[in-house]
UniProtKB/Swiss-Prot annotation:
Job description of the protein: Binds directly to 23S ribosomal RNA and is necessary for the in vitro assembly process of the 50S ribosomal subunit. It is not involved in the protein synthesizing functions of that subunit.
Native species: Nautilia profundicola (strain ATCC BAA-1463 / DSM 18972 / AmH)
Family affiliation: Belongs to the bacterial ribosomal protein bL20 family.
Entry-linked InterPro entries: Ribosomal_bL20, RIBOSOMAL_L20_CS, Ribosomal_protein_bL20_C
Record-given protein name: Large ribosomal subunit protein bL20
Annotated gene: rplT
Length: 116
């Protein structure tokens, strides 16, 4: 006797439709459209996990640059000064200091200026 795909198909469909939860209209309710949208969504998710790292680095650089200019130095000269002064702080930490601890950041800028 031939075995039908009933339970396997139902499980597969349920899995896709569960992933499509929150999508608009037929992309949530109809298996074929939901499957296409879920595949596309997974591609976007994969791509944007890489993009997120770039976006945060850009944001940190923008914040550091703004804080540097308040202390009369450009971002590139500041980074150069840090390298020459052997101060090993990454951009994430520097951006956090620039936003939350401007006095500490100003001291770091002075050390970077002195090393130039």
């Amino acid at each position: 006797m031939r075995v039908k795909t009933g339970t396997v198909r139902r499980k597969r469909h349920k899995k896709i439709l569960k992933m499509a939860k929150g999508f608009y209209s037929g992309r949530r309710k109809h298996f074929r459209k939901a499957k296409e949208q879920v595949e596309r969504s997974l591609v976007y998710a994969f791509r944007d996990r890489k993009q997120k790292k770039r976006d945060f680095r850009k944001l940190w650089i923008i914040r550091i640059n703004a804080a540097c200019r308040l202390n009369d130095i450009s971002y590139s000269r500041f980074i150069n000064g840090l390298k020459k002064a052997n101060i090993d702080l990454d951009r994430k930490i520097l951006a956090d200091l620039a936003m939350n601890e401007p006095e500490v950041f100003a001291q770091i800028v002075e050390k970077a200026k002195a090393a130039l």
